[in-house]
Design a protein with these regions (language model features):
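A subset of signal/propeptide-processing and intrinsically disordered low-complexity segments
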Residues: 1, 12-13, 25, 66
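Bacterial N-terminal signal peptides that target proteins for export
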Residues: 1-7
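Bacterial N-terminal signal peptides
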Residues: 7-17
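An exposed, glycine/acidic-rich loop-and-rim segment of catalytic or binding clefts
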Residues: 23-58, 64-373
Length: 373
């Protein structure tokens, strides 16, 4: 997704900053959840960071700012540990211009055409922060909000209340995102939301993955399998045309494991496409994707209850963002597999609905499973 200008009106001062995890460090093996202060905002609100460790020594760090994933430490086939998510060592990077590294995006993840949608006969105007379109909830989406965190047995639950009219959306929306790190080496995301007025909801996590390690170069040598056999065709601004096309053996076809870079030059601007998942039974987890780094042997499998998955190859990373360890994140240094409803669904009644009404509960689950071989 495109970088966007940070529009925070207040300058944010930091304190008590916490250094990022170092590649190659052997993790502890006692399962735990520990909380620290990552920094402090100018209104004196703390930003908390939680370290979740499972019994196998797999470790994730998550923060209240943007209900975000900061680090994910995973061993390779030889047991060497690396952080496989792009991001920053310190909080200040997340408070300034960045491409949604690891954060929860909403109220509506992905694009809404021309920054407007009509619901129950009323048209709602939203910010156009991605060319002519609305992207990831607007100028101050869920990624730029400080959530409340609560440690659980093997994870953290984050909650946020989005006020009626925030970023132009109707209804007071109460949102929860729970991160769980299981002893099966799964990082699980569970989303819930309720509203007091009809609204639209589409939530995802915008982690950028590099299974060779954050900052280890581009991901074009990763091998990807995408199980869906169809994708939503888009115009030149990333908005669906309404046509759902078959991957049919072309550059979009990852139904069999394929190096991401193999057909990359055939896709104008790189991959940034929503694949259509055959979800089957409502609420059931369905295998959506698998990615492998041949050099390290690390493997990540993705399953979800969502009807779509956005495959994005970090096309707008240009070296201007300095991330973990002082690395300049260049084009294609990370890939995103964002589980979601389709882009522009509020304006496409033929797509799976993103409407949420009072008395209903939005629920969604996505699981990332890690291994090495």
């Amino acid at each position: 997704m495109n970088l966007r200008l940070n529009t925070l009106a207040l300058a944010l001062a930091l304190s008590a900053q916490h250094a990022g995890a170092q590649t190659g460090q052997k993790p502890p093996t006692n399962p735990s959840v520990k909380m620290e202060t990552f920094g402090t905002l100018t209104n004196s609100d703390p930003v908390e960071i939680y370290t979740i460790t499972n019994s196998n020594g797999l470790r994730a760090r998550v923060m209240t700012w943007g209900a975000g994933l900061v680090d994910m430490l995973v061993p390779d086939r030889d047991g060497a540990i690396a952080d496989v998510t792009l991001g920053f060592d310190k909080l200040d990077g997340y408070l300034t211009r960045h491409p949604y590294f690891g954060t929860t995006t909403g109220r509506y993840a992905n694009r809404i055409a021309k920054g407007a949608f009509t619901l129950d006969g009323k048209t709602y105007k939203l910010a156009t922060n991605n060319g002519p379109n609305h992207l990831h909830g607007g100028l101050l989406g869920f990624d730029m909000r400080n959530w409340k965190g609560a440690a659980q047995a093997n994870g953290v639950r984050f909650t946020y209340t989005s006020a009626d009219g925030e970023e132009g959306y109707p209804g007071t929306l109460k949102v929860a995102v729970t991160y769980t790190l299981t002893d099966k080496n799964e990082l699980r995301f569970d989303y819930e939301a309720t509203t007091d007025r009809p609204t639209v909801v589409n939530l995802t996590n915008h982690a950028y993955w590099n299974l060779a390690g954050a900052g280890a170069g581009d991901i074009l040598g990763h091998e990807l399998t995408l199980h869906p056999i169809k994708f939503t065709a888009v115009d030149d601004t990333g908005i669906p045309t309404g046509k759902i096309e078959a991957v049919a053996g072309g550059a979009m076809d990852f139904t069999k494991a394929k190096m991401i870079g193999k057909d990359f030059a055939k896709v104008t601007g790189g991959y940034d496409h929503n694949y259509v998942i055959d979800t089957g039974k409502p609420g059931a987890l369905v295998a959506a994707a698998e990615v492998r780094d041949p050099k390290s042997g690390r493997v990540m499998k993705v399953s979800t209850t969502e009807p779509g998955i956005q495959f994005y190859t970090g096309n707008f990373l240009d070296g201007s963002v300095i991330g973990k360890g002082g690395t300049a994140y260049k084009k294609n240094y990370g890939l995103c597999l964002e589980t979601q409803h389709y882009p522009d669904s509020p304006n496409r009644p033929e797509f799976p609905s993103t409407t949420l009404r009072p008395g209903e509960t939005f629920r969604s689950t996505t699981v990332y499973e890690f291994s090495a071989k």
